[in-house]
Amino acid sequence: MTKEQVLAQQRADFAVAKFIEEILGSGHIKECTFDETRDSAIECAKQNIEASSLTEREKQVAKESVDKTVHEIAKIFKKGMIQSGRLIETK
């Protein structure tokens, strides 16, 4: 793994741990924790793409696809979390 991959993985691991800690502790998740979990997952995926043997164009397309897909999924998930009362809006 590259240094960037390791750092992205550590960031994602910490974000997931915080997400789990909040949901198990209070039954709720702060919006900033939700957003950090999403953003760290995207960064982790992008670092893995960057380290791959794809061409530069393929890497660019893959990163854009990951970004768009994860944001769409997170948007749907976040909406459900807000409707269920599990997400605490912090913005």
Sequence positions of predicted segments:
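Amphipathic alpha-helical core segments of compact helical bundles
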Residues: 17-21, 25, 46, 50, ...
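Charged low-complexity stretches with an acidic bias
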Residues: 62-91
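Extended non-catalytic scaffold regions that mediate assembly and binding
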Residues: 1-3, 45, 59, 87-91
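Intrinsically disordered, low-complexity regions enriched in polar/acidic and amide residues
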Residues: 4, 8-9, 57, 82, ...
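A compositionally biased, intrinsically disordered/low-complexity signal enriched
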Residues: 23-29, 54, 71, 82, ...
